[in-house]
Amino acid sequence: MSFQDLESGRGRSTRKFNGGRQDSTQAVASGIFQINTGVSTFQRLVNTLGTPKDTPELREKLHKTRLHIGQLVKDTSAKLKEASETDHQSGVNPSKKIADAKLARDFQAVLKEFQKAQQTAAERETTYTPFVPQSALPSSYTAGEVDKVPEQRAQLQESKRQELVLLDNEIAFNEAVIEEREQGIQEIHQQIGEVNEIFKDLAVLVNDQGVMIDDIGTHIDNSRAATSQGKSQLVQAAKTQKSNSSLTCLLLVIFGIVLLIVIIVLAA
């Protein structure tokens, strides 16, 4: 099941299921679709890091997108575990088990893409500093620039004072940008760890579902073998019955001939 047909195919694949089982499968399919869309957006934002478009606003958008995807991953993982637990109950349609196993593999694939994008984001956010437009600098910057060429001595002293204020403000501003960047990097690494843990749990779940699907396949193969064997036995029984019927007819004919000969002899 590809990501392109998740939205169109999930309805057909789960419509036959009823109650909560249908809801859990649909929720997983919807979650995977949203994660895949979010990861595509996240990758485009990551590719912008280190370019002139890399601004604090872009970093903030990247941060929000990353948190949104992380929440979707947690919710979808919980729904998938719920669906998997349901699949282990008796009386569950085998088609649902197969559909859930495919969704688990799709979830695993999109998580790999998210992990790669997270790693790239961490590397680029560590390497590059966001570009800060002049309009974002402290307001005292303009005043300092105006007073750079004073006509009087008092104005020159005031200009120097303004330059010192500007320097202090700019240093404080840069420190705030650096602190915000470091905080973002820490959050990335924290989320990478969380996604890695979910990925490990998912690998166990996928393996478990693979064993379950193999059991379903073995059961189907055994049923087919038993059906084929039953047909063979029926054919053999039919042949035996036909052979017995032919032998009975032959014996009746022989008995009739013998009886006819005896009657002829007695009549003579």
From Swiss-Prot:
Q: Does the keyword Iron feature in the UniProt annotation?
A: no
Q: Which GO terms describe its biological process?
A: amyloplast organization; intracellular protein transport; late endosome to vacuole transport; negative gravitropism; stomatal movement
What SUPFAM superfamilies does the entry give?
t-snare proteins (SSF47661)
Residues in compartment: Cytoplasmic: 2-246
Main location group? membrane
Phenotype of the disrupted gene, per the record: The sgr3-1 mutant has a reduced gravitropic response in inflorescence stem but a normal gravitropic response in hypocotyls. Reduced formation of vacuolar membrane 'bulbs'.
Record's Pfam families?
A: SNARE, Syntaxin_2
Family note? Belongs to the syntaxin family.
Q: Cross-referenced PANTHER family, in alphabetical order?
A: SYNTAXIN (PTHR19957), SYNTAXIN-22 (PTHR19957:SF339)
This chain belongs to the protein called Syntaxin-22
Gene of origin? SYP22
